Amino acid sequence: MAEKVGEGKASEGEKKKNKFGKAAKVSLGVLGGLSLLMGYISAAGMEESEREEEARKPIDTFFTALNARDIEGCRRTLHYPNIQIAGNEIIILDDPESFQIDFQLLANEGWTYSTLDSCSMRQSCNEKVHFEVQLSMHRANDSRYATYQALWIVTKLEGIWGIQCRSIFPSGVRST
């Protein structure tokens, strides 16, 4: 029986077409999978970035309130109990009234304002972020007279981000 052209055996051109067609389908499948994976990675990075941004707000607000000499504003940025660690001294503040700043004492040493020189997220999860912080104290002539390295821990309690712990390293450069 005679075989019709196009039936049974594929021509060389059709074989190449099918070969490249399979490769293209596999490539598209791999690219689609990678694209999906990159979307997940991007979404996770965006979620972490948004968490860092939200968790950092109480730190920025704390410095704004501090420089305005607004003790109540500072208190509102903290979660209680609040832990302060300076050197090896640990202070636990049970309520907002426990948090005090002696602005007169600071003024007597020449303090006019403080700056948040750097604030970098080091670790995070959905409800807690660790920030490595560098802060400085300045005189009226803008000269810096003290710089401190610190670890600040910000937590999310009942949907609100607040500073839970401030640990300042005693190695700050302080000139008088």
Range-by-range predicted roles:
Residues 6-18:
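Juxtamembrane low-complexity tails/linkers enriched in Ser/Thr-Pro and polybasic
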Residues 15-27:
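Membrane-penetrating hydrophobic segments
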Residues 28-76, 80, 96:
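Short, low-complexity N-terminal intrinsically disordered segments enriched in polar/charged residues
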Residues 78, 88-89, 125, 133-135, ...:
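A mature extracytoplasmic/lumenal domain signature
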Residues 83-93, 108-109:
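A short gly/proline-enriched turn/hairpin at secondary-structure junctions
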Residues 85, 123-124, 156:
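Generic beta-strand structural signal
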Residues 97-145:
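Surface-exposed, charged secondary-structure patches
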Residues 145-176:
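Short beta-strand edge/turn micro-motifs at domain boundaries
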